[in-house]
Curated annotation (Swiss-Prot):
Any GO molecular function: structural constituent of ribosome
Annotated family: Belongs to the universal ribosomal protein uL6 family.
PANTHER family with a match to the protein in the record: 60S/50S RIBOSOMAL PROTEIN L6/L9, LARGE RIBOSOMAL SUBUNIT PROTEIN UL6M
Organism: Helicobacter pylori (strain ATCC 700392 / 26695) (Campylobacter pylori)
Protein name: Large ribosomal subunit protein uL6
């Protein structure tokens, strides 16, 4: 029994939702999202409450039930409050700047790294901290992971790009022979 799928999703007044066949349409004043659901899941929208039910009793239907419940909940949260991830850049000479539709990273390579900012993503740079904001949870996480992958933190000095809440397990360096 899916505990995630059982939840009833309350849709706030700032978000409008509608069901068209197997499609769920969500929109607020700025943007809209569409969720195509599988035919093994039944969608019910009544009084700004969204619920899902599995069509069959097999494991596949129950898996889709929880998955689409979580995806719809993420879209509603994204359109009402939004998602954000914070990255920190640590290292001597490592710099971050916001260019015209690009994020310019100086990470110790022989060339600067220019990352194009995708549509629907907003970035704020303060000193060596990057804040990524957006309404799509998957896209925000993917952009943060791609930026981190340019220079992941290394365990000896902790240099690199890391999530703000990430804990780097440090290693001791070599010890000299006696």
């Amino acid at each position: 029994m899916s505990r995630i799928g059982k939840r009833i999703i309350e849709i706030p007044s700032s978000v409008q939702a509608s069901v068209e066949g197997s499609k769920l349409l969500f929109k607020n004043s700025k943007e809209k999202h569409e969720l195509e659901t599988h035919n093994r899941v039944k969608i019910t929208l009544e009084n700004n409450q969204l619920s899902f039910q599995p069509v069959g009793e097999d494991a596949q239907s129950r898996a889709y039930w929880g998955t689409y419940g979580a995806l719809a909940n993420n879209i509603v949260i994204g359109l009402s409050t939004g998602f954000s991830k914070t990255l920190e850049v640590n290292g001597v000479g490592y710099k971050v700047a916001l260019g015209n539709k690009t994020l310019d990273l100086s990470l110790g390579f022989s060339h600067p790294v220019k990352y194009p900012i995708p549509a629907g993503i907003e970035m704020v740079v303060e000193k060596n901290t990057i804040t990524i904001k957006g309404s799509d949870k998957q896209k925000v996480g993917q952009v943060a992971a791609e930026i981190r992958s340019f220079r992941p933190p290394e365990p000896y000095k902790g240099k690199g790009v890391k999530y703000s809440d990430e804990v780097i397990i440090r290693k001791a360096g070599k010890t000299a022979k006696k």
